[in-house]
């Protein structure tokens, strides 16, 4: 199990990223628009820099829904490899069977 504080911090970052998503996209579009004057683009980049760092999507870590483990996660199941193996071996994931050839 991961530390509860790490899981909560990641959840907070995910909330902030969702909240600030529209603002970040709008500012990035202004910054990348070459038809606008340099002053406007620079002002938009300053506003983007003023936004909190934790509001960025890249700071959110993919974590296991059961254990909170941050490594070896499968996006499709939102589980880490350890939890996925336990659930699959007990038959709790529909359609997943142990391979044999």
Curated annotation (Swiss-Prot):
One of its GO terms (cellular component) is small ribosomal subunit. PROSITE patterns: RIBOSOMAL_S14. One of its GO terms (molecular function) is structural constituent of ribosome. The keyword Lipid metabolism does not apply. SUPFAM superfamilies: Glucocorticoid receptor-like (DNA-binding domain). It comes from the Bacteria. Keywords: Ribonucleoprotein, Ribosomal protein, RNA-binding, rRNA-binding. GO terms for biological process: translation. The keyword Transcription does not apply. Belongs to the universal ribosomal protein uS14 family. Part of the 30S ribosomal subunit. Contacts proteins S3 and S10. Binds 16S rRNA, required for the assembly of 30S particles and may also be responsible for determining the conformation of the 16S rRNA at the A site. This is Small ribosomal subunit protein uS14. It comes from Gluconacetobacter diazotrophicus (strain ATCC 49037 / DSM 5601 / CCUG 37298 / CIP 103539 / LMG 7603 / PAl5). The lineage of its organism: Bacteria, Pseudomonadati, Pseudomonadota, Alphaproteobacteria, Acetobacterales. The gene is rpsN.
């Amino acid at each position: 199990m991961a530390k509860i504080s790490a899981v909560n911090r990641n959840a907070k970052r995910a909330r902030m990223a969702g909240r600030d998503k529209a603002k970040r996209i709008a500012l990035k579009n202004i910054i990348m628009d070459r038809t606008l004057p340099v002053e406007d683009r620079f002002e938009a980049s300053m506003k983007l820099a003023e936004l909190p760092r934790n509001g960025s999507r890249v700071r959110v870590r993919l974590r296991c829904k059961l254990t909170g483990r941050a490594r070896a996660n499968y996006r499709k199941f939102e589980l880490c490899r350890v939890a996925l193996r336990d659930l699959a071996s007990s038959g709790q994931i529909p359609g997943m069977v142990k391979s044999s050839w």
